[in-house]
């Protein structure tokens, strides 16, 4: 069977509700605007339908990102084997204590959302916790690297919102990753649209445990139109 290494099952109701190629910032903004249009029943039906569609497509294992408990009932009775990554994010969030109830579900572990949306202390705490793989959004847009250079759309967005970042001194997302995550921790790096050879060298030179590059081509084309430089991998 096939493996879907990166899924947001609980967001299945948003399929087709957000314009294509609006870029990462546009996608995030549109998501916050449209999500309240859907009832709890519509959301639940979309989760059921997505699970069934994946099984029909030959998918037998899924790495699913979760921010809440709305999809666990479907996953518990599905024929698909799910591994759930409970996602921590928020520049004003100091700990993951509010997510701990979700970790009671089977095959569920904590992961940071990305290297640009989590402050240093919680990132290091999550990276040091347990031995399950981490699933991290990585270099999805040019703005991620630009943020560490105090420029670009993420930098402007954060400045306008009054967010401060205590991690920009690392110099780049890749350098932050290897400084904060132990070398023997397995990682799934998701999207990878804007990785460079230097990023790859930094990452692969650090980790002794497996690193999986999860490319999400359909998602990348839909959100930004960007394609990972697969020739480097």
Where is each model-derived feature located?
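Histidine-centered catalytic micro-motifs
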Residues: 1-12, 133-142
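A cross-domain feature marking catalytic cores of carbohydrate-active enzymes
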Residues: 7, 65-66, 84-88, 111-114, ...
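Alpha-helical scaffold segments that flank or form the walls of functional sites
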Residues: 13-77, 99-105
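Active-site-adjacent C-terminal substructures of enzyme catalytic domains
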Residues: 113-124, 163-233
């Amino acid at each position: 069977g096939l493996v879907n290494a990166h899924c947001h099952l609980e967001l299945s109701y948003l399929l087709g509700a957000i314009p294509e190629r609006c870029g990462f910032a546009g996608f995030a903004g549109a998501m916050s605007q449209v999500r309240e249009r859907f009832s709890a029943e519509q959301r639940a039906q979309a989760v059921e339908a997505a699970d069934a569609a994946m099984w029909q497509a030959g998918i037998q294992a899924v790495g699913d990102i979760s921010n809440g408990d709305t999809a666990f009932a479907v996953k518990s009775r599905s024929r698909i084997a799910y591994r759930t990554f409970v996602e921590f994010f928020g520049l004003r969030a100091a700990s993951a204590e509010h997510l701990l109830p979700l970790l009671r579900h089977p095959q569920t572990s904590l992961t940071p959302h990305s290297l640009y949306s989590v402050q240093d202390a919680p990132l290091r705490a999550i990276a040091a916790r347990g031995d399950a793989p981490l699933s991290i959004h990585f270099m999805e847009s040019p703005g991620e690297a630009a943020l560490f250079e105090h420029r670009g759309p993420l930098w402007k967005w954060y400045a306008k919102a009054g967010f401060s970042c205590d991690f920009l001194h690392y110099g780049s997302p890749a350098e932050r990753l290897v400084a904060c995550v132990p070398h023997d921790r397995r990682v799934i790096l998701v999207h990878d649209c804007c990785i460079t050879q230097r990023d790859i060298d930094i990452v692969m030179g650090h980790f002794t445990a497996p690193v999986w590059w999860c490319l999400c081509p359909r998602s990348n084309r839909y959100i930004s139109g960007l394609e990972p430089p697969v020739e480097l991998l």
